[in-house]
Amino acid sequence: MLAHDRRHAFGPWVFAAAAAYFLLHLYNILYMLNEPENPAILIWRFSGSMGLVPDAMPLIAALPAAAAFAVDLNSGFAVPAVLRSGTRRYLRSKLLAACIGGGLAPFLGRLLFVGLLHVLYRGDVAMAAEMFGPEGAMGIAFTGMAGYVGYFAGVLFVQFLAGAFWALAALAFSAYVPNVLWTVCLPLILHRIFLELDAWTNLPAWLNLSLLQDSETGLSFAPGLLAAVGVFGALIAISAVLFYRRGKRRLTYA
């Protein structure tokens, strides 16, 4: 990865976006802060699926690095960068930066929130099991400490994949329309389009990206994780190919 792109993938925008995502989750549970008797996993369940969190996640993922290609083209930096590094290396660097930066922002935001939950609330698996039972993705969290940790690890991994996709979708768009504002906003628009398609076509829950990114599809843990890896993995690959092909063509005539 080029030094310029490393600053996008691991720089201050990643941590700023992660902090914003963390604060959105915290805002959703403000009314429950005076209820420390609740189990942490119950508060977690409510925090991620309410309010602005699902809708804002695509924007959070796009902030760190998705617009880097558009910025380079508009500033004239792309041409000398390609001359120094070569087209293939330059485009791969942009893909890697968007993937890592887009995935890390929601991942770190939720990881910090998980830590806070287990400071404010009890990690009571038994009580949560009584409330929710063994159904759905949360079922594995009720099988002991290994399942409890595994549940959160799986959900955080899905968040990383979802963030990587939204960022790469925006990056691919920027190769066709190198406008910074439109590039950053594209994931929000795309997210709404997917929601409307789901409402009109009645697709399975595991194809609803809003539910899938929050592991709320109703599937048990392993099938839900496989569905997320398959769906987001395929979308990541498609976005990467679209960006690489169009980006290469655009740089040829830059």
Please tell me what each predicted stretch does:
Residues H25-A68, L96-A175, L212-G230:
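Secretory targeting signals
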Residues R84, Y176-V177:
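Helix-loop interface residues and adjacent transmembrane-helix termini in multi-pass membrane transporters
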Residues A68-L104:
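Helix-loop-helix units of permease transmembrane domains in multi-pass membrane transporters
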Residues M1-A18:
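Aromatic- and glycine-rich beta-strand/loop motifs that create alpha-glucan
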Residues A17-Y21, V180-F194, L207-S210:
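Central hydrophobic cores of alpha-helical transmembrane segments
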Residues V231-A254:
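Junction motif at the cytosolic side of a transmembrane helix
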Residues F10-W13, T87-R88, R92, N179-W182:
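Membrane-helix interface segments
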Residues L120-P134, I189-L207:
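Juxtamembrane non-transmembrane "cap" segments at the membrane-aqueous interface
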